[in-house]
Amino acid sequence: MFFIFAFNLWQGYLVFLFYKYKQKPAVVLPKILPQNLPVVTLQLPIYNEMYVVARLLNQVTLLNYPKNKLEIQLLDDSTDQTTEIAAKIIAEMRLKGIDVQHIRRTERTGYKAGALAEGLGASKGEFLAIFDADFLPQPDFLLEMLPMFYENEKIGLVQSRWGHINEADGWLTRLQAFFLNAHFTIEHLSRKQGGGFINFNGSGGIWRKTCIIDAGGWSADTLTEDLDLSYRAQLKGWAFGYMPQVTSPAELPANINALKSQQHRWNKGAAECVRKNLLNVLKNKQIGYKTKLHAIFHLGNSSIFLCITVGAICSLPLFVLSQKFVFLHVFFRLGSFFLCGFFLLIIFFWTSYEAKPKNFLRFFCRFVGFVSVSMGLSLYNSIAVLEGYLGIKTPFVRTPKFSQNKDINPSENLYLSQKFPVFSLLEFAFALYFALGIWLSFYFKDYSLLIFYVLLCGGFGVVSLKSVFQFLNKSAT
């Protein structure tokens, strides 16, 4: 409970930093003369992406950059027809004079990190731009991003803001966009301006090659190779840039089981980075206390799910006992005070809410939905966090992509798991467990945790049933 309260306080501090630096005039970056443009390698790591690889390759042909200074690497670890689809398009690209390399590996060693390392060794560029398969690099991306590197030779990375090409698909994609917009609007900017480390988000960014090499290169010992390299580079003294005015549109998971796969990787990888990098940050005497505090809450943010899960499970028996033992009743009153930290969370998300004009009722419904579904994912994510802290290794599981092709039925996606989501049965049991909490609140006429139990019951119920129904829908097709 204390960590949840402290985390919410820190989110409030990030809002303060956001408003503090919001009025700071943006630095006007000079354009680079065409003859001075550097050689850039565009890396596209893919693995079994037959639904989106054509869209990706067609999009990168639109990049506004001299052909003699742009190298494209398709880092293709695929084992299905993705490779054949890509090969045909690459042949057409080469006929247009585009320098594109189709790099294949005999073994998928190191997963995405291994593919990026392979490409790094063969790259021609001074800078390396990286995009995942579901992204749509905008034509002027390179021309808009590269000038920041010339502000300071110690800038090792410049990250763009993510956009969402399918936000309007349904409530699940809207809630993801709700969260990601807050991350890219407030967290990145506030950490950067407030003296904290920021991170490469895995896609939509440009690295200086010498920075990657100096930091030790790509490593596959965590599932979030992007976060890991980001911290190692900044510990080496490299600075990172962020350009929120440059948007890199991408596809959001529209399937709950695909989202859970992505969330597992992100949260476990963050916990692995705590094990690997946090102590190095705290021990570094060249780093100030503000940077260290930023790192604690940045790297440790996935632990919020563990705190929610443990607190929620323990709350019900303690709630029953509190009806008999007065000292426990006082504890719950104190716990209710800590929940006031959620008001700071409301302010945090309201600040980043991008609907124009802002409608508080619509915002609040989206906020409640986000909190409830996040609680519903907390058990699944908690296991991921525990695995990360305990050093339990699991494969890098890619997030299934769906494409925006209306001729393709999402339920027919071959990359979705063929196994029944057994874990959803446990999540549904949790929904029933917290439904009991709702009933007990009325039975004891003690409503101190009623809202908490409603959010938990609704979240676990929605997540579990959505997982099962989407699986059954796929099975039926």
Name each model-derived stretch.
Residues 90-127, 139-223, 235, 256-296, ...:
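Long helical/loop segments within the catalytic core of UDP-sugar-dependent glycosyltransferases
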Residues 221, 230-249:
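Catalytic donor-sugar/metal-binding loop of nucleotide-sugar-dependent glycosyltransferases
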Residues 269-274, 361-409:
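Membrane-proximal soluble regions of multi-pass membrane proteins
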Residues 78, 132-136, 221:
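The conserved acidic donor/metal-binding loop of glycosyltransferases
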Residues 1-36, 294, 298-312, 318-325, ...:
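N-terminal membrane-anchoring/stem segments of glycan-assembly enzymes
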Residues 52, 284-307, 404-435:
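Loop-to-transmembrane boundary segments
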Residues 13-69:
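N-terminal signal-anchor transmembrane helix
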Residues 58-103, 108:
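Acidic donor-binding segment of Leloir-type glycosyltransferases
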